[in-house]
Structures are given as C-alpha cells and as structure tokens.
Amino acid sequence: MKRKESYLSSDFRETVALRFPAQAKELNTAFDMRLSALLAENADASKEKQYHLKRQILPGIAAYETLQRVMPKEEALQTVHDYVERLARTSHKQLAALLHIPGLYRLVPGVFVKSTRSVFGPAAGFAPKELQTGNGVWRVDMMKCPYHDTCTEYGCQELCRCFCDSDDISYTGLHPKLIWERSMTLGRGNDRCDFCMKVR
C-alpha cells in the first residue's frame, strides 16, 4: 500500500501544476527522487524521529530545493512557509473551536506536558529541559531539535523558521485564558526554544 503523502508533498504538486504546468512532470520527478534520497539517508533514524522526518522535515527540504529550480531562493522559502502556515492556521481553527467547551482550556498545559514527553522527547531527537509542568503551566526549554539539526545538516537552516512560525500560528490566541509565550527558537538563531503555555 502506498504511504499517504505529506501535506507538503501534496502542496508542492499543486504549486507546480498551477504555476509550472509545462515542467510539472520533470519537477515532480525531481522532487520524488530527492525525497527518496533523503528518506534513504535517514532510514536508520528512530521510529519517533521518522514521524517528524517523513511528515514535515524531509518533504519540506525536498520541496524547497526543487522549487529553487524554477524560482529564486527567497520565493521558494516563502512558498514552503505558505504550505506550513496554511496547515497551522487550520490547526489553530480546530483547536480554538474545541476550546469553546467550557473549562477545557485548563487541560491544555497538561496535554502539552504529555505530548512533549511522547512525541517531542529524546527518542525523536529533541532535548527538552522541563522548567515547570504543573499548576496550569507548561514551561520547557528545548535545547536540541531535529527540525533545526536536519535543516542545518542539509544546508538550509533558514527553512527551520517555517516550522518555528507554525507553532506561533497554531498556539497564539487559542483562548482568552491561555497564554502562549516564546521569545527564542533554535531556528531563529538562539541557543534554545523557550516554550511556555499557561492558564491566565
């Protein structure tokens, strides 16, 4: 059975079909070959890290590199940013709608604690340093991140900012009584990502 495509792969195909129809076949082939090579080079990564690599990081790199064949680097970066931003805005809408359920917002910091430990932990290539994880506060410094590390490894560190921005779009202003804070990210050149989600 064919693996379901990442949203980044689908969005890339849509872009080339609409904007570069004459080269669409060639660009899709180039993208597929690059993505296959990236997946092969990272085949020994843990199952936990593969989740992030397959879903976002590697399709993002393949799309970014392939788009540069037909547009300037800055435009390619903005195009991939648009893909990530679109998903983040959808995610924000869904979460905000869910948080209309009375009192549910209080559970959000606790959910962030659990998801950090299960999906964004050392097994996936992250290095979270928990500063506060109780009383309606989730405060974590992320000292290492596979999004940043992989983008840097492939010479496209600037791409990581797309994923950093997606967090801010997804979690800012979810509910009047929830505060999302982050002043630093590895992808924006800082030495850590200082995450905080707390009940007001």
PLM features: what roles do these ranges have?
Residues 1-67:
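N-terminal, charged low-complexity regulatory/assembly segments
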Residues 3, 126-130, 180:
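Generic structural motif
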Residues 24, 75, 178-179:
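Secondary-structure boundary/capping signal
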Residues 49, 98-125, 173-198:
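Unusually extended, aromatic-enriched hydrophobic runs near protein termini
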Residues 55, 66-155, 159:
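Amphipathic interaction/junction segments at domain boundaries or subunit interfaces
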Residues 136-141, 146-150, 154-200:
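C-terminal non-catalytic interaction appendages of large macromolecular assemblies
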